[in-house]
Each structure stands twice: as C-alpha cells, then as structure tokens.
C-alpha cells in the first residue's frame, strides 16, 4: 500500500495512453468471435438460493448482496444499450462510490448471465464488488461504436481535476472473472477494456480481451490499462489484438497464465517495484515485453519471467539496462525456463541491438545485482552506476502519477488529458543505435559479510552454521539453473500451478449452505456448532457454501481432510471469546486436517478474522498434506484483522498513539498467529493476503490504527508449498517465517513492517515463544533492530523466491528515516538454509539480508527506482 516518487516521464507516457483511449471513433471492424446465446445457464451461481446478508450494513434485510444485471433491466441482446442498467445493478443500495474511499459493509456480487451486453460508457466497479460472468457460457461486454470513456470497466474513476474516487494503493477487495470484453466495434485508434487501478485482495480471472488486430501505430487499443496501485493478482487471461495487450504499472504484482495473440506489444511495463510473470504465452506479437521505459533512467524496478513461451514474436524482452543505466539495480530481469525459439532476439536493448539471441530455450538468465558465492568467478559484470540522491519519498506520494487535470470536452466526465510532449516516449520498435556493452570483467560491489551496521544473530533459531560470504556483481548473463525438486514440478517440468476452482460442472443442489443448516452469520450469534455440523456431514461430491455474513466462532472448528468450501463474496469467519484469549496457550480457529492427514481440501472466497481481541488464536492451522499434486489449497482467502466494521478493533478504539510512549491496549490485540502450515502439511496458496490493518476501512476518518498481531505465516512443511501472489503485513514479530522446511516456492511475496514500531518495539505485547522458534532480538542494541522481520528462513532447503517486496516506511509513524533509508536494521534472515532468492526489493532496511548475525547485503549498494533491489541471493556456488 505504499507510495513513492512522481516521475514526469511516467506522466508523459500515461498522457499519451489516455489520449488514445479517448480518440474519436472511425470505421468499425467486424467482431472476431462468436456471439454467445442468451439462454438460461446451468451454472450453479445463477440459481443457488440467495441468503447472504451484510450484517454490519445498518440498512436491514433489504440490502442485496447478489445482483443479476438482468433484474435491473439489462437485455444482453447485442443491440440494446445496457450501460445504465448494469451501473444500477452495481451501485444500488447506497454503496461505496465517489467520496467513500472504502467500505466493507456494502458488498456486491454482480452476475452477468450469458449474452452480449452493449455499453456506451464505462461500467464503474464500486468498492468491494465482484463482477462475475457465467463460467459455462461467458457473456460478452461490447463497447458500442459511440463509446466514450477511459475503459469498458473502470475500477477507479478519474474526476476532471485528475483525482480518483478511491486511493489507488488502498483500492482493495474487488474481482472480475468469466467475461469477454470486446473493443472491435470501436475504431482502432481508441479504447481500453479494463482500467485496473487496484491494490491487494484484487483479482482478474478467466477473461478474454478482444481488440482490433493489426493497424500498426494507428492501433491504440489496450486490454488492461493500469496506471498505479499496490496489487495484486491476475490469472488465466487471453488478449487478442490491440496495440498493448496490457499496459502495466504497479508497486508489485503477480500474474499467472496470461496469453497474448496478435498484439503490437504484448506487455508494456510502464513502472514497477517488482513484478512476477509465471506461464506467459506470447504468440504473433511484435514485442513480448517492453520494460525500457525511462531509457537511461529506468522506471522499472524488477521483472521475473518464469516457465514461459514466446512464439513468432521477433523481440522478446526490450530493456534499457546497460553499463551506463541508472539506478544501479533498476531494470532487474530474471528469465527462468523461457522458450524464445520463436523470437529473433530474446533480449534486446532499447536502441535495437541484440543482448541475447533468440531461437532457443533460456534456462536461466540474470540481469542486475547478483550476490552469490560464485559471482566473482562466473558472472559477466557491468560496472556499478552512481546517481544523484533522489528526493525523499513520502508515504503520501505515488511513483506512478494520475493524469493531469483534463481539458473540457463533449465526452462524459472522464479525463481527456491536455496535450503535451513527454520527456521520452517508448516505442515498440527501438532504433538501430548500438548500446555500449562491456566485454570484460569490471570490479563492482563488495565482498564480505559486514556492512556498516552488524545485525544480531537470532537466539530463537539455529546458530551453529557459519555465515557464508557472498560477492556482489552487476551482471547481465546466463547462469546455471538451480535444480528444483520434482515435488514442485508438473509433468512438463514447469513449476506446478492450479486455477481457483469455480465448480462449473457442479449443480446447485450439491452446495450445502451453512445458513440453511442453521448458522446465522449475523455477527452476533455463536455459529460454531452449526458450522461444525455442516462440515461433518458434507460428502465428497458436495461443496460447503458460506452465504455472505459474519460467522462468530468461539472454539476450534475441525475442518475434515476431504472437503470443499467456498463463500459468497468473502463471508467473514470471526474468532471471538475466552477460548482464544490466552497467548501462552494458543489454539486454532480453523484446524484444517490433523497431523499426518492426506486429503483433498479446497478453500476459496473467504475472510478469516477476529471479533475483538484474540491473542490466543491461530486463525488457520493447516495440517493436511496433498493426496494428489495441489489437492490441498486456498484461493482468494484473506486474513484481515481489525480496521473494519464488526471487529471492535477500529479507529474509535485503537487509534494510533505516536505522541506518547505506548503500552499496547489489550483491547487492541489481534491474533497470536495468522497462518501455520505444519510439519506434515503441504499447501497451494494463491492470491492470499494476510493483513493486520494499518488503517480504518469503514469509519469516516479512515484513520491509522494500532493493532497488535503476533505473527504472520509460519511454514514448517516438508511437503510442497506453492505461494502465488501472497502478502503478509504489519505483524509484530515477523511476517513470514520458514523453518525446518523444504520445497517452498514463492512468487511473489509482499510485506510491510508495523507503522507503530518501535513505539512499542517487536517484543511487545507478544513475548517470543520458544515453542514456535520466535525471534528474540536478544543481541539488538538499537530500536531500529527490534522491528518485525519481513522474512526469516531457518534450517530449510530448496526454498525459492521469485519476487519479493519487503517494505519499512515508518519509525513510529514518522518518516525522517526514509532520508537515510534506515527505518529498520534488518529485513530478511537466512540461516543454515539452501535458498535461491530472486528479484528481492526492500525499502528502508539498512541490511536487506543477514545471516548468522552478520549483514550480508546492504541496501545502499543496491539502489533501484524506489526500493533497493537485488537480482539474486545465493550462498552456494552457481
């Protein structure tokens, strides 16, 4: 949710993009797909009994959580203008629109039956909205020839003064899936399918973007236009045609299984801090990914491309990274198992020269600062670069700007930017001016184990292993590919992945509603027994369904080892009561399987949280191991503690206290731990956000708050753990801890240190517990040392991280520490472990990585556009 620096160069690129979105219409091409029929669907979501309520809404039983757009007058006949009806379906019920910023009390699940829905203005997706099409017969949303607006679906509208409805990096809890969005009725000179300016707990899934094919530079159509935000996850998307399949800019993001066909440029990366692409497929495009924005002064922090294939596309990746580019670690690029046999050049400079030729599979290629035991002897080095110190980044700044106030026009009130020349406009076809690429080894960086400030050795974990020294090299080279354990790989040799289940072929009568079984979900009634009864009686062919509501749980729910559970737009499971009050004897709210179990567990579309203080609660204890690969997992399940209605942990009770020496109020304690993946378990996690709230979502002040939550995610599994698009924020002792584990794959992770630390520090109010191998901070001598670890890896093997953003923005809500990038001392601990960490970005931590009590990787030698970034950390030889 952080923000960074404003760049006029980025602004110029955004202005040109927006001009394209609002260009006048011209000749209309014919559609490029078959129009779906409008018959009734057998998809369960369209016919299941609707009993969901918004328990903290205050509007009573009349508030509708589920909305079918046809109930609001939409025709879906391919000719009627359905704009007003669709927007009414979304907005009705005094929901969170312009001027609201955020609210959890007005959720809406908006369903599109099969059909073709013509729109002439943007569909505005209000906060806490899921737009869901029929999964069996995907509906089409088609832009009329007269369409005017920023995009067919707009997640964060702009006003004429350039302001947004929602704060981009706090634009949480929204999703779109199962749609075809069609721009082929527009002239090729304008149009975007989705304006996706979002933050955590957001997703796009199973969407096809239809745009005009060909047209050269005159084609300005875009599938996804993303200007900024703090995401996020998207998966299973297909982009056909257009200029840019996707125009991306965000702090951090994870994408999986994106396919681009016949785009001028598949992906234009405008800016980021960290972005992971898994399973890209690019076919018949001009450029697969252009990350060269900014030229010499790079705007892209880091990109990971994994298990991907580029076919019949001349240019794979266009980069501006070279011997002279700044910042030093800007433009970090990792290629891991990427098939460029269909490309002339795999990696190309902005000026057009080939860096890596195409025609083969690149097993492993690294661009950026590598810290390894073998860097000095094996890596092709580039010299380090020195740049002027940038302006101090502030929390209330943003690294990718909104467009400037637009000029008045005859179009609806969406921004049409004033014309203006940007500093530099990236092109899809770089010029032929050669770039200087060094041919010899040039010394860069340092070798050793001690930066300016030593870090303490952990006393809650193993200390016998000596700290292996690492050497820094600024590289642009192929490296040996680390061997990944077979347990993590699918049959084709790629890292395993699995889409969120939608149960398309399950009939509605196979869903067991917890409300029909007696649970109330009203945020007042103890629903423990009713929920347990439903779980106990569910059979293998049934799915337990949580209608939207707030379900109070007062003792441990035992989740069987073979079960499927899904919810209606994130129903809340809330731990409360005396059973969860003892932090010295914590118990789980949801105990998923028993130690030693093997089975098939699927959890999706849920919120797990507390009502009031629950310092003796582990929200989810995950014990079950997979029976078949990936058969146990969580998709779109979010851990959200405090900061919203019904939690009793809000800004009116737990406001921040930076001006006094703080003794934590027991009424503002959260949970003992959010997620524990135990020793015998395995798990597949996708789009899972573990968030201890830093600010209020529902009360009008949206003020910052102090919620004290002991620990984030503890992973001890010796099975397989996959984590795609996960984040863990604002936990007191640590956000992620991996100990005595193996076979852990993370792509990507994001963390934030609690804003209130070090008032109090990490040792308050949750004392380190030896049973859980907590950090003790016993050797710390400064306040900056006693802050939450972003990630600890202890006594573990085969741990892979492809992309990480681990941030520290405050010292007791003040930001003077950003001037020296020293808000805390240490962020990542690696001890007695075999790890491969790629694309790691940290903010304002003096030491990025420590081991055995010594700082190995200092942030000051790895400056990027906003964070400090390294391409690779590995303590062994490559």
From Swiss-Prot:
Quote the catalytic activity from the record. Hydrolysis of (1->3)-beta-D-glucosidic linkages in (1->3)-beta-D-glucans
Region annotated Disordered, chain positions: 373-472
Q: Which InterPro entries match?
A: Pectin_lyas_fold, Pectin_lyase_fold/virulence, QRT3-like, RHGA/B-epi-like_pectate_lyase
The keyword Hydrolase belongs to this UniProt entry's keyword annotation: yes
Note the CDD domains from the entry: GH55_beta13glucanase-like (cd23668)
A single GO molecular-function term is:
polygalacturonase activity
Enumerate the subcellular locations listed in this protein's record, separating them with semicolons: Secreted
Its main localization is secreted
What does the record give as EC number? 3.2.1.39
Q: Locations of Pro residues compositional bias?
A: 400-416
Annotated Pfam families: Pect-lyase_RHGA_epim
Q: Where is the composition biased (Low complexity)?
A: 433-452
**Where does the UniProt entry place glycosylation sites?**
228, 257, 290, 297, 505, 659, 795, 862
EC class of the enzyme, as a word: hydrolase
Signal peptide positions are: 1-27
**Keyword line:** Glycoprotein, Glycosidase, Hydrolase, Secreted, Signal
Any single GO CC term annotated in Swiss-Prot or TrEMBL for this entry: extracellular region
Function (record text): Probable glucan endo-1,3-beta-glucosidase involved in the hydrolysis of fungal cell wall. Classified as a small-oligosaccharide-producing type based its the end products: glucose, laminaribiose or laminaritetraose.
What family does this chain come from, according to its entry? Belongs to the glycosyl hydrolase 55 family.
Q: Please state what the protein is called.
A: Probable glucan endo-1,3-beta-glucosidase ARB_02077
Provenance organism: Arthroderma benhamiae (strain ATCC MYA-4681 / CBS 112371) (Trichophyton mentagrophytes)
